[in-house]
Amino acid sequence: MVAIALCAGLAVKVLDAPHSFPSRVNPQPTGPPVVPGRTLRAALAAAVTFDPKPGAVDVALDGRVVVNANAGRLTSVRATTTTNWPLFGTLSTSGKRWQSNGPLVPGISYQVTATVSGSAGVAAKSTSTFRTLTPVATVTATVFPDGLTVGVAQPIVIRFNHFITTAAARTAVLQRFTVTESPPVPGGWHWFNNRELHLRPQMFWPVGEKVTVTSDLNGWNAGNGMWGEGTTRAQFTIGNAHVAVANLATHQMAVTDNGRLIATYPFSGGRDMYPTMNGVHIVLDRESVVHMVSSTNGIPVNSPDGYDELVYYDVHITDSGEYVHAAPWSVDSQGRSNVSHGCINLSPGDALAFFGFSRVGDVVWVVGGPRPPERGDHGVMDWETKWNDWTPAVVHNMFPPPAVKTRAPASRTPPRHAR
């Protein structure tokens, strides 16, 4: 049935009962469903992932903390230890990824809080905690020389407080040291034992060279459960080229300063039973007086070859106890024959002059004798180790890793006195 009604000139058609008008009061949405803000915030927070994973323990110290936003964009990330020590990082330009910049602190808990924003200004936070490992031991390093003017043969000596035995740790630690100098020169690294790493130039250092060594061992995996700790900075300058050539066959020592001959000293070297070591020695240290005792070299004091006395103007050139020093008892033999226990004997006047001239790292080059250099002796090992056994590097900024070599440590205590 259809009814027609006229009302003010407007015709309205009224449908039979089975038909009805579409609703105009609550129209149905035609777009995507509307998600409440609380639900969106929860979804944003759930889309944030952390590495290390939440609740992780024994986290390695050389890793990086990474936060990813799989929905929305990261607007801030705050990472701190439980003692409020901050861990800084970098947020990508896309806002999708944050990564920490530095190593982690050992044996402590971290809290990482990420803020992420989505559409329509909705923001959410997500938090994760983890704990780093506690090292079996921490490894530190010292650098020598530091704050000194040294001779042209002086190596850079890095000593660790624990044995570094794994190839991976030895390779990785090289990336922790930066060596800069002006101008750059060819150089090389060499491990002489498990605790001692040296660097020297291929040839003697240029006169006037200024060298800076810095390191950051934090986050270095030193192997066997040990981790590096601490930073170092050392600076030194290369002085004039002091080179003394001691000829055991002629009993004369020629001393030059930057290539200019300044003195020739008659001397007496080690006799047949106690020959002086050949090779390029470096001055290890100087002492105005040394109490020399023969028992330090296995010679009983009360034997015919024994001695126990104060010796003056001592320039130390080997671990085995060789010095250039004053020897008034052998003046008659100096320039004529070798009668010492291995040291280079000078007259008191010449010894005083040489003592005043010498500095750590100077060259004392011994030639003409029968005794070869001992490669484990700090006095000769740097310049008597063939250059092919060093890993070449340009002495400037970073160095490539060295060949891994393990040799018995050369002990320098207690001191030995050849006389």
Language model features by range: what are they?
Residues L197, I238, V245-L248, N345-D350:
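Short, glycine/acidic-rich beta->alpha junctions
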Residues G225-D332:
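Gly/Pro-biased beta-strand-loop elements
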Residues T113, R176, Q252, Y313-D314, ...:
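Conserved beta-strand and immediately adjacent loop positions that scaffold enzyme active sites
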Residues V152, N278, S294-R419:
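Exported/periplasmic cell-wall-interacting domains
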Residues W85, G219, L261, A351, ...:
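Surface-exposed, flexible loop/turn segments at secondary-structure boundaries
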Residues I158, H162, M203, H251, ...:
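Solvent-exposed, polar/charged alpha-helical surfaces in well-ordered, non-transmembrane soluble domains
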Residues M1-N240, F267:
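Acidic, low-complexity Ser/Thr/Gly/Pro-rich repeat segments typical of extracellular/periplasmic
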